[in-house]
Design a protein with these regions (language model features):
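Class I SAM-dependent methyltransferase SAM-binding "motif I" and its flanking Rossmann-like core
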Residues: 125
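Conserved non-catalytic scaffold segment of RNase H-like nuclease domains
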Residues: 1-122
Length: 125
């Protein structure tokens, strides 16, 4: 049990591109912050998106196609885990902070549909 009560959850994605309908998740992060700003819990993912990661995207987040294939987990597994993690944080009553929420949450919705990860219902942002 954390010593600091959780206050909010944070979420971020790095992807293969900018089109929310076609880009794929490469990395994801969910953190839980305490009321004092401390990190209470965190979880991160590296996915093999199943497609080539363009050089421009790799230059931004540092993950190449080769690394994703060698070290990443299957995209369908990663997407299901992200959706489950966000649902859990929402069930905890935590508001979600997302730097570029329209992009990240819409892309996750498309990925959830693509990988049959159940309906993704974004939590309060």
């Amino acid at each position: 049990m954390p010593l600091t009560p959780p206050a909010l959850a944070v979420f971020d994605l790095e992807t293969t591109g900018v089109d929310v309908a076609t880009a794929r998740i490469v990395t994801a992060y969910v953190g839980v912050m305490g009321v004092d700003g401390s990190l209470v819990a965190s979880r991160s993912w590296l996915a093999d998106p199943g497609v080539e990661i363009p050089a421009g995207a790799a230059a931004i987040h540092g993950v190449t196609t080769e690394r994703a294939r060698a070290e990443g987990r299957p995209a369908a597994t990663v997407v299901r885990e992200i959706v489950d993690e966000l649902a859990s944080r929402s069930a905890d009553g935590l508001p979600l902070v997302v730097y570029n929420a329209p992009y990240d949450l819409t892309l996750l919705k498309h990925e959830a549909k693509r990988h049959h990860a159940g309906p993704f219902v974004p939590p309060p942002v």
